[in-house]
């Protein structure tokens, strides 16, 4: 997929020295956790505690915070980040969101999950991360985003975030991508919203989402440009 290859190129430039790894990802199965373990191990070797595909919480907060404020029907609002990796999205929501949130980050890679748990408990400077709201919570669990039965019950999240995970899974074939979409909808509450962040053009992504979520509303909002690249937030709402 051109979008993922482009994102990998940008990510490699940002990371500084991972060209060989990006090539490995382009030719490997995204469902193989060993590939992601290698990626996240290399990330941990650097001085930056988190690594983001596309963009991080800093860029996303202007879009997310108004949605969280508007959606405050239950406190704290439950948020799931599928394929969280070592992104700053979960930690940013936990430490900087003024609204109460209960955030769960799941990832296939045990290396990524262990790193984020360590960051949560010890922080970059040895201090635990502090919540932006006293009622906020943050947890990380190793799990396959295509099968969340062991970690998430049906209808248990008001907001599901997917930042680049669909892009990666789709490289392994459409059945896996649509299984990911189905699982996101299973754990989403009837009033909830799935948000996919990607640089993939709406002319490509929207028909895929409409096919995989009949009866739902698919909306698109342009984000950025960040680093010279325009991104998109794909919002899918409604019960299947």
Report residues per predicted region.
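Class I SAM-dependent methyltransferase SAM/SAH-binding core
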Residues: 78-148
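Core SAM-dependent methyltransferase catalytic element
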Residues: 222-240
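Conserved alpha-helix/loop element of class I SAM-dependent methyltransferases that forms part
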Residues: 52-76, 92
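Conserved beta-strand signature within the Rossmann-like core of class I S-adenosyl-L-methionine
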Residues: 191-198
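A short glycine-rich, Lys/Arg-flanked "PGG" loop and its adjoining helix->strand segment in the class I
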Residues: 175-190
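A short SAM/SAH-binding and catalytic strip from SAM-dependent methyltransferases
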Residues: 158-174
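A short acidic, Gly/Pro-enriched loop at the edge of an enzyme's catalytic core
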Residues: 146-160
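N-terminal, positively charged/glycine-rich alpha-helical extensions of SAM-dependent methyltransferases
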Residues: 2-50, 54-59
């Amino acid at each position: 997929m051109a979008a993922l290859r482009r994102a990998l190129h940008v990510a490699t430039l940002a990371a500084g020295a991972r060209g060989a790894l990006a090539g490995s990802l382009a030719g490997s199965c995204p469902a193989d956790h060993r590939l992601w373990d290698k990626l996240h191990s290399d990330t941990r070797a650097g001085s930056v505690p988190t690594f983001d595909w596309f963009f991080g919480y800093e860029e996303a907060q202007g879009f997310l915070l108004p949605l969280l404020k508007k959606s405050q029907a239950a406190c704290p609002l439950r948020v799931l980040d599928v394929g969280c990796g070592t992104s700053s999205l979960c930690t940013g929501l936990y430490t900087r969101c003024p609204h109460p949130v209960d955030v769960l980050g799941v990832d296939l890679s045990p290396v990524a999950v262990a790193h984020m748990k360590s960051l949560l408990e010890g922080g970059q400077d040895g201090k635990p991360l502090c919540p932006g709201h006293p009622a906020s919570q943050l947890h990380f669990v190793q799990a396959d985003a295509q099968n969340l039965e062991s970690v998430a019950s049906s209808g248990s999240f008001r907001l599901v975030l997917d930042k680049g995970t669909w892009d990666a899974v789709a490289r392994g074939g459409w059945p896996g991508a649509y299984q990911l979409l189905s699982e996101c909808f299973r754990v989403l509450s009837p009033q909830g919203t799935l948000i996919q962040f990607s640089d993939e053009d709406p002319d490509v992504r929207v028909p895929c989402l409409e096919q995989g979520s009949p009866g739902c509303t698919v909306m698109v909002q342009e984000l950025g440009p960040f680093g010279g690249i325009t991104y998109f937030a794909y919002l899918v709402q409604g019960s299947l």
